């Protein structure tokens, strides 16, 4: 029994390594260009070896889309919770992150708009959206305001960062993120006055 559990854990660990390698391959080559052979090479497997871990290419693509969401989400909210005491620094770091994560977001968008995978990736997006209230609550708690006060700015930040990652155009990002910076700073200052 213990050997079976250990074997399954090792397989799950290997599968995660493969998802990481495949996502990097998709990001580099593109969803429609990357072949199974490319994915196997990226994962350091013999040709077709990836199917020991995944049943179909669709399963690989959807696992990679889920990982893309996870990478972007963890990186973005990691910055928010690390830097929120300095709103300007936080928004600057989010802009830098958007530059860095843009290729990953573009892969995710290509999955979302594809005829083949678009509907199948929606549950992952719904799960992501379901986590937004948690993040809103944490930010509100840190800033000493209500969820309702901060929610529009959390969502505007997400929209601004997503737009910037997709379109790589600062003109779309800067006005939105400046509005967020102004209002979050106002909320943070209010907390300072209330605590002072």
Residues of each region from the PLM?
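Amphipathic alpha-helical packing segments from all-alpha helical-bundle domains
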Residues: 73, 77-78, 100-103, 117-152, ...
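Amphipathic alpha-helical linker/stalk segments
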Residues: 64-90
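Helical hydrophobic small-molecule/effector-binding pocket
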Residues: 87-113, 118-122
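Amphipathic, non-transmembrane alpha-helical scaffold segments
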Residues: 11, 15, 19, 61, ...
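Amphipathic alpha-helical interface segments
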Residues: 21, 25, 93, 159-164
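Helix-turn-helix
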Residues: 17, 21, 25-59, 63
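Hydrophobic alpha-helical segments that form the core
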Residues: 110-112, 145-170, 176-186
């Amino acid at each position: 029994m213990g050997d079976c559990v250990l074997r399954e854990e090792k397989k799950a660990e290997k599968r995660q390594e493969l998802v990481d390698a495949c996502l990097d391959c998709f990001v580099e080559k593109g969803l429609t260009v990357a072949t199974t052979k490319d994915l196997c090479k990226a994962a350091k497997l013999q040709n077709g070896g990836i199917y020991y871990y995944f049943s179909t290419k669709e399963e690989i693509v959807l696992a990679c889309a889920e990982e893309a969401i996870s990478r972007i989400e963890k990186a973005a909210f990691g910055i928010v919770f690390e830097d929120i005491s300095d709103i300007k620094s936080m928004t600057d770091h989010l802009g830098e992150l958007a530059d860095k994560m843009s290729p990953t977001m573009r892969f995710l968008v290509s999955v979302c708009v594809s005829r083949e995978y678009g509907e199948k990736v929606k549950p992952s997006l719904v799960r992501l959206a379901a986590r937004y209230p948690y993040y809103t609550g944490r930010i509100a708690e840190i800033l000493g305001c209500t969820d309702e006060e901060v929610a529009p700015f959390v969502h505007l930040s997400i929209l601004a960062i997503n737009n910037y990652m997709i379109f790589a155009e600062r003109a779309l990002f800067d006005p939105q993120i400046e509005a967020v910076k102004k209002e979050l700073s106002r909320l943070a200052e209010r907390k300072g006055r209330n605590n002072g």
